[in-house]
Amino acid sequence: MKLIVLMSIEEYADVLRKILINHRIPVFSETDVDGYKLSESEHLHASWFSGKQSGIYSHMFIAFVNEQKSDEVLSAIEVYNESHEQLNPLRGFQLDVERGV
């Protein structure tokens, strides 16, 4: 069994939903995430008192699937990213699930 984790900025969350539906993933979870990206020159302490940095509205999806479905979904994300040039591509990875209860 695999746990797949997929992420996108808010504008592309529907794309990930469609990929999951098109690949017949029967159960998945979705949550809103505030994403932060610091440039290499930025340090957390550099702006310690200067106020809150605003995040980028993102979405994270998770699903428990078999290895074949994981490969299908991650391949679909690769195909989408290759055919759509964007600053924030869709992201996805899989984790092995050793045991579940």
Predicted regions, residues:
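Positively charged, small/polar-rich N-terminal and surface patches that mediate targeting and assembly
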Residues: 1-101
